[in-house]
Structure formats: structure tokens, C-alpha cells
Amino acid sequence: MSNRFAVILAAGKGTRMKSKLYKVLHPVCGKPMVQHVVDQVSQLGLQKLVTVVGHGAEMVQEQLGNVSEFALQAEQLGTAHAVDQAASVLANEEGTTLVICGDTPLITAETMEALLQQHKEAGAMATVLTAYIEEPAGYGRIVRNENGHVEKIVEHKDANEKELAIKEINTGTYCFDNKALFASLSKVSNDNVQGEYYLPDVIEILKNEGHIVSAYQTEHFDETLGVNDRVALSQAEIIMKNRINRKNMVNGVTIIDPSNTYISADAIIGSDTVLHPGTIIEGNTVIGSDCEIGPHTVIRDSEIGDRTTIRQSTVHDSKLGTEVSVGPFAHIRPDSVIGDEVRVGNFVEIKKTVFGNRSKASHLSYIGDAQVGEDVNLGCGSITVNYDGKNKFKTVIGNGVFIGCNSNLVAPVTVEDGAYVAAGSTITENVPSKALSVARARQVNKEDYVDQLLNKKKS
């Protein structure tokens, strides 16, 4: 197999997005558009990948890191001009170069591989990825000769009446013989309505020089969708969402209502897990097998063990063990590690806490900056008082501890193994192992007080 290279065009302004965020960084199913493209082309066995950047170059470089080399298009003078910016990296290379836009997040490695294979089998100098659509307005048209070979590509604004009637369109993805590509770029003129250097003109140049120009027509037009505004962004989101949901269902995940379930492109979900409506799974989340998630649950960048149930709750940047029960209406905040067989009940908030195996906080509690041992019971209304207005402090609760209802543990404080804290206590000092700590005012009953008070008011 000959050397393979790719150029991703990601320098456009994206003015139609009407956004401060650089266009190719707008997310589709939780991942920037250009990252989707890079992830797919990276499966093609490339020797070099060059991303052409312009506006927001630093942000794109930060997003992609060292998986790509970069070329700067300081002034946007057209797609041919953009590709030419990669000349310093690629111009002297022997092989085949794929050119693709960074705002086409739906393109798949399978389609690009088919394009490359067509290019090789045809012995072509250039091969165009095309599609057939009923309403081609706005797209460049594929003009073929009497033998069915690609003659040229005409941009919509430059097309005559006959050419506008053509329904085979240019998707903006190509592959070229690398040296032929860069030799032709210098011959491209900007004598057109837009005054730009169009990459499709390379097709006509190569054709006029007697080279073979081939085309591969994809049956999956949705893969070629270019995102130029928020409407197209929403269309891409829907298509990608459906693709991800279908993949998970084929792999053994039950999704009760796919139209109301959102799964990020990088999430991994085990078989026999059930996702209820309103479930949103974001980022690099990993969910085990036989889990039940939702309804109305958000999980972001977290790891969920097998046979865990999360109902109407939020989990962010945390790790949950096996057979954990969360919710309804619980909130597990970042940097929490929840053990196996744990119960986190309704209206419980846990933040930056290690919560041991088989421990329970079943209702109305806040556990923050804490280390909770195994087999601990935190009664309703248990609070770790971790913040003094300036600093956060840690609470340590040992194994087998029982915390009574409506208790405050004022950090820094330690409750040692096997200790009990009486309901209603405010603990400000360490509690020894197996001790009972009572820290509340003694109850005083005043006999006949109410009658005396009422009689006094009457008089």
C-alpha cells in the first residue's frame, strides 16, 4: 500500500454560526466537529496528518494536540489556497493525499477507505467523493463527459442553467496523487465570482492534462453534511445521536426511548444495561453491564460498575462500584469514589469523597471532602461541615460507624471505627472507637407550662 496522507481544512471563519467559538470546535454529541474528523481519518493508516488552521488556530491546536501537524492559512483565499499551506509538510512526499473539511463530523472511516480504494483501482490522479441529491442548491456540481468520467466540478455560483440541473454534487472530500496535487495548485486561478482559489479547479487541470479523474458516489449523503450554521449543527447532532444509539442497541444495550436518550461519542456501555428516557451520558463515561440508568439522569466523565442503578440523579467525574443504588434526586459531584453495594439515596449530595463498601446515606445529607469507611450508616440529615468561609477541611469516618439523624460533623474531625453519634449532635472533636458521642443540649420538660402561658395571655 502506498503512503497515505491527509489534509483537514479547518481555517474558515464560520461567520454563519454567529458564535465566539471557532466553528470546527462546536461539539456534536459532546465532541468537537474537527475531533470527529481526526478520529475517523486516524483509522486509515496515515503517514502524516496536517490540519490547516486560521481563525482560532491556537484553540484547534490545543484540542488536537500532537495527533496532527498544523499549517496556518492567515488569509482565507479559498480551498486550493488552504491546501497549498500544507506544501511545506507534504509537497515532496510520494503517495495519496486525502483532503477533507473539518466541519464534516459525520464522515466515517469506512467511506473514506472506499474512496481511497476507488482511487487506487481506477489508477486516478484525483478521485472525488460525490453524492446524488434531489435538491442540490448551494453545492458544486459534478460535470461528466459522454463516457461518464468526471470532466470538472462547477461551483453553484458559477454554474450555468444546464449545470444547475445536475443532481450529482461535490461533497468536498477528495483524494489525489500527492505530487500531482501540489504541482496543480500553482495553476489554479481566482477568476471566478468569489475571487477565490477553488480546490475543485485542480480536477479540471488534471483532466486537461490527460490524467484520469475518478469519482466514488456514496449512498450515505448524511455523512457529507457540512456544518455552517446552527441549523446544520442540530441536524448533525440528530444524525450522530441516532448513529450512536443504534450502535449501542446493536451491542446489547436497551434504550427505552432513543429519541430522548443522549450518549456521547466516546461513552462505553455494557450489555444488558437499560437506559430510560431523559438519560444523558456525556464525555468519556464507562458504564458496566446490567445497570439501570434513568429516567432523567446525567452522567459525565464517570465510571459506573456492573449492576448499578441510578435514577433521576447527576454524577460528574466520579467512580461508582458494583451494585450501587443512587437516587432519586442525588448529586455525586467530581472526585468522588463510591464503593460496592453502596446506597446514596434521595436528596443526598456527595463531593470529593471516598465512600466505602456497603455504606449508606439514604436521605437528605451532604457529604463533602470526606473519607467514609465501610459499613457506615449516615442517618437522615447528616452533614459534614467542611467549609469555614475560607478553607475546606476533611472529615474521616471509620468503619462500622453509625451517625444519627440531623448530626453535624464539623471538620476537621475524625469519628473512629465502630463509634456512634447520637441524633441531633454537633461534633467538633474526635470521637474514639466504639464510643457514643452525644453533643446536644439536655432536654428540659416544664410541666404545665403551656396552660400557664395561655392563662397569662388571657389575663
Curated annotation (Swiss-Prot):
Region of interest (Linker), residue spans: 231-251
Organism from which the protein derives: Bacillus cereus (strain AH187)
Location in or out of the cell: Cytoplasm
Region (N-acetyltransferase): 252-459
Function: Catalyzes the last two sequential reactions in the de novo biosynthetic pathway for UDP-N-acetylglucosamine (UDP-GlcNAc). The C-terminal domain catalyzes the transfer of acetyl group from acetyl coenzyme A to glucosamine-1-phosphate (GlcN-1-P) to produce N-acetylglucosamine-1-phosphate (GlcNAc-1-P), which is converted into UDP-GlcNAc by the transfer of uridine 5-monophosphate (from uridine 5-triphosphate), a reaction catalyzed by the N-terminal domain.
Assembly mode: Homotrimer.
Family indicated by similarity: In the N-terminal section; belongs to the N-acetylglucosamine-1-phosphate uridyltransferase family. In the C-terminal section; belongs to the transferase hexapeptide repeat family.
One GO term of the biological process aspect: cell morphogenesis
Residues that hold Mg(2+) according to the record: D103, N228
Catalysis performed (reactions): alpha-D-glucosamine 1-phosphate + acetyl-CoA = N-acetyl-alpha-D-glucosamine 1-phosphate + CoA + H(+); N-acetyl-alpha-D-glucosamine 1-phosphate + UTP + H(+) = UDP-N-acetyl-alpha-D-glucosamine + diphosphate
Single GO MF annotation: magnesium ion binding
Protein's name in the database: Bifunctional protein GlmU
EC number: 2.7.7.23, 2.3.1.157
Pathway: Nucleotide-sugar biosynthesis; UDP-N-acetyl-alpha-D-glucosamine biosynthesis; N-acetyl-alpha-D-glucosamine 1-phosphate from alpha-D-glucosamine 6-phosphate (route II): step 2/2; Nucleotide-sugar biosynthesis; UDP-N-acetyl-alpha-D-glucosamine biosynthesis; UDP-N-acetyl-alpha-D-glucosamine from N-acetyl-alpha-D-glucosamine 1-phosphate: step 1/1; Bacterial outer membrane biogenesis; LPS lipid A biosynthesis
UniProt cross-references to InterPro entries, sorted A to Z: Bifunctional_GlmU, GlmU-like, GlmU_C_LbH, Hexapep, Hexapep_transf_CS, NTP_transferase_dom, Nucleotide-diphossugar_trans, Trimer_LpxA-like_sf
Positions contributing to UDP-N-acetyl-alpha-D-glucosamine binding: 9-12, 23, 73, 78-79, 140, 155, 170, 228, 333, 351, 366, 377
SUPFAM superfamilies referenced in this protein's UniProt entry, alphabetically: Nucleotide-diphospho-sugar transferases, Trimeric LpxA-like enzymes
Name of a matching Pfam family: Hexapep
Recorded GO CC terms: cytoplasm; membrane
Region (Pyrophosphorylase): 1-230
CDD domains assigned to the protein according to its UniProt record, in alphabetical order: GT2_GlmU_N_bac, LbH_GlmU_C
Residues that coordinate or bind acetyl-CoA: N386, Y387, A423, R440
